[in-house]
A protein has these predicted regions:
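Sequence/structural signature of outer-membrane beta-barrel proteins
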Residues: 8, 112-114, 171-173, 230-232, ...
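Transmembrane beta-barrel wall of Gram-negative outer-membrane proteins
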Residues: 44-178, 201-208
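Flexible glycine-rich, low-complexity coil/linker segments exposed to the extracellular/periplasmic environment
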Residues: 9-79, 248-255, 301-342
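Flexible, surface-exposed loop regions and adjacent strand-edge segments
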Residues: 17-23, 117-128, 169, 178-189, ...
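N-terminal periplasmic accessory domains that precede
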Residues: 1-4, 18
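Short linear interaction motifs
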Residues: 68-73, 187-192, 253-256, 268-272
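Face-selective signature of the C-terminal outer-membrane beta-barrel domain
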Residues: 156-167, 197-342
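Outer-membrane beta-barrel domain signature
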Residues: 75-78, 138-140, 189, 193-197, ...
Length: 342
């Protein structure tokens, strides 16, 4: 068993951006806070675009109110904790009536934080001159949780060996980010974008293989079968935008909000068999006859949905100046104020 603790001078113990998320985020798994709400999930699965043409105002209101508010939208500042991790490993071998049985297992957990500040610019050529289009100050705080497991099982004797290996890797990234600066493409006004994100990348692979010898080793048969699945899940990938009023205070640009749900799954199945027969021709020569067959099948599915709250009527100054979770509270999600659309 191994355990580790660490930190760095820029992140650990200093106040940086965070958002709450769910109570179990530190494990790399959330507590279903980020599950797609029922009515929205049904619309996604049925291929119905979420808009006023396909759903009533009451249904759109229910969908909008079903989206998680403050825990996934409100940026705050807290002291960043230390990094930590541990690793467990073990194994054994044991002689049985069928042969030698071996087992090995390794599991690990790592939790790290990385805070960054910098500048992000986009430019374009005007003639021979490169001029900035946007120039943003960027502040980010990223929490990465990595989980891994490796397990192996084998059984072998003089003529036969079978091995089964499983690998699971999960990498979860939780990031709170804010960018602010002039957007010269939109008149040079100050724009601020706040982001809350949660990305889950997973890999699972299982492989079983065998090697067998018959006829005093003259006939050898090797076989293998494998399954691998990779996935990327990004629920509630959110952006909320602000402009600046005459007094220099940030106010909501409600048309700049975006809440995205995306998934990607990649499945691979493969297998094969090889056989070889050795025919002695003399003490110095032999002939080897071999044959083999293999197959591979791959399937990929990807899906993405972008949701946005649109202002049905002009927002009041009080609404535009309110906190993010107040503006998108149930009180303001109704047929006359904010309405959800895809």
């Amino acid at each position: 068993m191994k355990a580790s603790i660490g930190g760095n001078t820029e992140s650990t113990g200093k106040e940086h951006l965070i958002y709450f998320g769910s109570r179990t985020d530190f494990t790399g798994f959330d507590d279903d806070t980020r599950e797609v709400p029922g009515l929205i999930d049904i619309a996604f699965k049925n291929g119905q675009q979420i808009n006023s043409a396909n759903f009533s105002a009451t249904e759109l209101q229910q969908m909008g109110r079903a989206l998680v508010n403050a825990p996934l939208r409100l940026l705050q500042r807290e002291k960043t904790p230390v990094d930590g991790g541990f690793e467990l490993s073990g194994g054994f071998s044991h002689d049985t009536g069928l042969g030698s049985l071996g087992v090995i297992a390794v599991a690990g957990y790592d939790n790290s934080w990385r805070a960054r500040e910098g500048f992000q610019e986009e430019g374009q050529f005007q003639g021979d001159e490169l001029v900035p289009v946007t120039s943003y100050a960027v502040e980010s705080n990223q929490n990465d949780v990595r989980l891994n497991f490796l397990g192996g099982l084998s059984l072998s004797n003089d003529d036969h060996e079978v091995k089964w290996t499983n690998l699971y890797v999960r990498n979860t990234t939780k990031e709170a980010r804010s960018t602010a600066g002039p957007d010269f493409d939109a008149g040079g006004g100050i724009i601020r974008n706040d982001y809350t994100e949660w990305f889950v990348r997973q890999l699972f692979t299982s492989q079983i293989a065998g090697e067998h010898h018959f006829m005093d080793g003259a006939l050898e048969i090797d076989w293998r079968a494998a399954y691998a699945k990779t996935s990327r899940d990004a629920p509630y990938e959110s952006r909320f935008q602000y402009g600046v009023d005459a007094d220099g205070n940030y106010i909501h640009n409600v048309q700049g909000n975006l809440i995205s749900f995306s998934e990607l799954d990649d499945d691979n199945v493969s297998g094969g068999v090889d056989a070889a027969y050795t025919l002695p021709l003399s003490n110095a020569r032999e002939a080897i006859f071999s044959v083999g067959v293999s197959s591979f099948d791959s399937n990929r599915d990807a899906e993405r949905h972008d949701l946005q709250f649109e202002a049905v009527n002009a927002l009041t100054e009080e609404q535009r100046q309110s906190r993010i979770d107040y503006l998108f509270s149930d009180y303001n999600i109704n047929p006359s104020t904010l309405q959800l659309r895809e």
